[in-house]
Amino acid sequence: MRKIWLYTIALLVGGPAYAEPIKTILNCPFSDGTHALLLATSTLEGQKLFLKVDGNIQSAFSDMPNSDFVGQIVMAKCVASGLIFALNYGTPYSKGVLLRKNPISHATERIDFSEKALPRWLYVGRKQMRLVIPNSGYEVAAKFLIYDFVNAKGQPEEVEGVDTLPDKLGFKVLRLK
C-alpha cells in the first residue's frame, strides 16, 4: 500500500515534467508571404491544437474559447494559400477551421465548422470562401451543408443546407477529399 501511495505522489509531482512540448504539425504559406502554423501538444487523450499566425499563438478553436478540444487530427492540409484542419474530439463530430489571408485586403479570414463529415469541396474567390460538407447527420433536410465567409461580413451564424452543389462562377473549386 505504501508503494502505491508513493507512486501516486511521484506521478502528481512529476507529471508536468513529462508534458510534451508544442510540435509543429503543418506550416502553410499565405498569399501575402506570411505563414500559418498548426501546432499541437500531445496528451493521453489525444492532441490539443494551436495556431500561430502573425507571430501570435492561440487556441485553434477561438469560436469556443472556454472549451478544451482534445482528440485526433483527421484532416490537415495546406490548400489555396491557406490552412484547413479538423480534429475528431468525440464521436461522431469533427471540429475544424479553414484559415487564409484575403488576397486583396490581406486580412485573416476563417471559417469554423463542426459536422459529422469532413469538408469535401473548397470554393475560393477573391472576396469569399466557402466549404461544402456532405450532410451525413441530416439535422437539416439537405444533401450538403455550406459554410461561408464573405469579405467584410464574416461567417454567418447559420449553416446553409442545399441539395445541389453551389455554382462555380467566380470561384476556384478544389476537392479536399
Residue ranges, per PLM feature:
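Extracellular C-terminal loop/segment signatures of secreted glycoproteins
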Residues: 97-117
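Acidic, small-residue rich beta-repeat scaffolds with periodic aromatic anchors
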Residues: 5, 20-43, 120-177
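Mid-chain, structured segments of secreted extracytoplasmic proteins
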Residues: 63-102
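N-terminal, post-signal-peptide region of Sec/Tat-exported proteins
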Residues: 42-78
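N-terminal signal peptide c-region/cleavage motif recognized by signal peptidases
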Residues: 14-16
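Sec-dependent signal peptide recognition
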Residues: 2-10
